[in-house]
């Protein structure tokens, strides 16, 4: 199947029709930059690694074809059964309207398991139960939500900065009681997280494949959402059989880290989450001049 047409206008006003490549066939003739070699390199790492969770990152500049590569990657995986990998694509930029990336990621995996029909229903039910418990805990642990809830709406989430003018002695007592309850329930929260992670481990028993989650546009997503997503992967999704490929412009993403955490070593911080870094093979300058991205 041929790709769509993209019409561009040059400086002289002449319209140029560029045939957008069809990415649904994987690395076929559309692979003009010979990036299938990188595909095989990543696949071999996934296949040869133990079941422990892995996090890869693809770092390159904007416009160099990262999205094209990962979509071809996914298509290549889908057209061959012998890779023993399921690939799921997730656009962080399109989903950053959500308050917490946990829901985004967990619902993605739930849908993946549910697509296996009867075989995946039992595991899907376990995952859904875990999503509800862990998700509600995360929601309650969010200070803005918690204060809004226990104040009966007196303190709205957009007025947290003026909290000193609102809290009364009675409300202060409610806040203290809420904090005490959260402290007492910490062990239950840990159990909920452990149960959720155990349910994720069962995905591979349903699919017989490792699951690769490709997270694209991480550097373009809302900074707090993108950084929370990293934390969620590390603490909640780091289980046997799950592999992540984070797609970003590293330099830009490190600026988001510095903006949130101040004067820290952003590069070292990022390396805490990522096991292997990759970059795209350099493109031919002549092809680049012709408009290929």
Where does each model-flagged region fall?
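Walker A/P-loop-proximal flanking segment of P-loop NTPase domains
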Residues: 1-94, 103
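Short, flexible/disordered secondary-structure transition segments
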Residues: 53, 120, 284-285
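Glycine-rich, histidine-containing beta strand-loop boundary motifs that form or position
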Residues: 60, 91, 150, 246-248
């Amino acid at each position: 199947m041929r790709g769509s047409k993209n019409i561009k206008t040059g400086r002289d006003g002449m319209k140029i029709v560029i045939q957008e490549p069809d990415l649904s066939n994987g690395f076929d003739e559309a692979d003009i930059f010979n990036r299938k070699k990188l595909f095989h390199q990543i696949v071999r790492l996934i296949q040869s690694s133990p079941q422990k969770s892995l996090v890869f990152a693809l770092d390159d500049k904007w416009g160099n074809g990262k999205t094209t590569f990962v979509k071809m990657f996914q298509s290549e995986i889908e057209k061959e059964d012998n890779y023993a990998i399921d690939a799921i694509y997730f656009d962080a930029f399109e989903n950053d309207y959500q308050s917490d990336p946990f829901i985004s990621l967990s619902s993605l995996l739930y849908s993946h398991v549910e697509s296996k029909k009867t075989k995946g229903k039992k595991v899907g039910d376990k995952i859904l139960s875990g999503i509800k418990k862990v998700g509600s805990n995360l929601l309650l642990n969010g200070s803005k939500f918690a204060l809004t809830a226990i104040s009966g709406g007196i303190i709205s989430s957009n007025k947290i900065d003026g909290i000193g003018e609102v809290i009364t002695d009675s409300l202060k007592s409610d806040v203290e009681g809420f904090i005490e309850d959260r402290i007492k329930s910490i062990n239950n929260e840990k159990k909920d997280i452990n149960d959720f992670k155990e349910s994720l481990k069962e995905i591979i028993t349903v699919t017989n494949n490792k699951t690769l989650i490709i997270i694209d546009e991480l550097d373009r997503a809302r900074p707090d959402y993108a950084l929370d997503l990293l934390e969620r992967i590390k603490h909640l999704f780091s289980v046997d059989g799950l592999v992540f490929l984070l797609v970003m412009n590293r330099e830009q993403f490190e600026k988001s880290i510095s903006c949130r955490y101040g004067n820290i070593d952003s590069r070292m911080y990022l390396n805490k989450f990522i096991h292997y870094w990759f970059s795209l093979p350099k493109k031919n300058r002549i092809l680049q001049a012709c408009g290929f991205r």
